[in-house]
From Swiss-Prot:
SUPFAM superfamilies: Ribosomal protein S18 (SSF46911)
PANTHER family attached to this UniProt entry: 30S RIBOSOMAL PROTEIN S18, SMALL RIBOSOMAL SUBUNIT PROTEIN BS18M
Keywords for this protein: Ribonucleoprotein, Ribosomal protein, RNA-binding, rRNA-binding
Gene (UniProt): rpsR
GO MF, any single term: small ribosomal subunit rRNA binding
Function: Binds as a heterodimer with protein bS6 to the central domain of the 16S rRNA, where it helps stabilize the platform of the 30S subunit.
Protein name as it appears in the record: Small ribosomal subunit protein bS18
Upper taxonomic lineage: Bacteria, Pseudomonadati, Pseudomonadota, Alphaproteobacteria, Hyphomicrobiales
Record field: transmembrane: none
Annotated stretches, region: Disordered: 1-20
Family: Belongs to the bacterial ribosomal protein bS18 family.
Length: 82
């Protein structure tokens, strides 16, 4: 019979925490006129991508959502993409 203690075990895999792309010294400012930046945080269907996927902090996610909504209202970004 095989002893359980003799079976080699795997090393545990630790995922590194993603850091917020908007915090730091040379981080870009969130602005409703910066369409190229805002489009990175919108899905193909036109929805705002959640922060658990983009690793944006809670405070910056609120700013980002407000900027996206403002750009949509002004016609700079589409509400829905077909």
């Amino acid at each position: 019979m095989v002893d359980i203690n003799q079976i080699p075990t795997r090393r545990p895999f630790h995922r590194r925490r993603k850091t917020c792309p908007f915090s730091g010294a040379n981080a870009p400012k969130i602005d409703y006129k910066d369409i190229k930046l805002l489009q990175r945080y919108i899905s193909e269907r036109g929805k705002i991508v959640p922060s658990r996927i983009t690793a944006v902090s809670q405070k910056k996610q609120r700013e980002l959502a407000k900027a996206i909504k403002r750009a949509r209202f002004l016609g700079l970004l589409p509400y829905v993409v077909k």
